[in-house]
Amino acid sequence: MLKIKSYVKVKSVAEAYELNQKKTAIVLGGMVWLKMGNRNISTAIDLSGLGLDTIQEFDDEFVIGCMTPLRELEINESLNEYTHGAIQESLRHIVGVQFRNCATVGGSIWGRYGF
């Protein structure tokens, strides 16, 4: 069972960083990569109010936020045009659409999932 003592929806990245300095604190996003089992978390840190769930396109780069769902990467027209569909093709095989709607870029990178 997952037990969370305190939940904080942070107002800044600096606040999240400060809270995350404790060993028993954890940043939680979509929570789909969280392993089942017994776990005690002193502080759950929620980044959802920081606007980190966007894909921004500039002249020479894309900026992808850590809270961006994998599904958003999969269906982003500009990103797929630029990569000739490679992003879309690589993501469509990850579990199912409902899962990709919840799984975030940051969680996938942090967990080092190679797909």
Where are these regions (language model features)?
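C-terminal structural segment of proteins
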Residues: 1-115
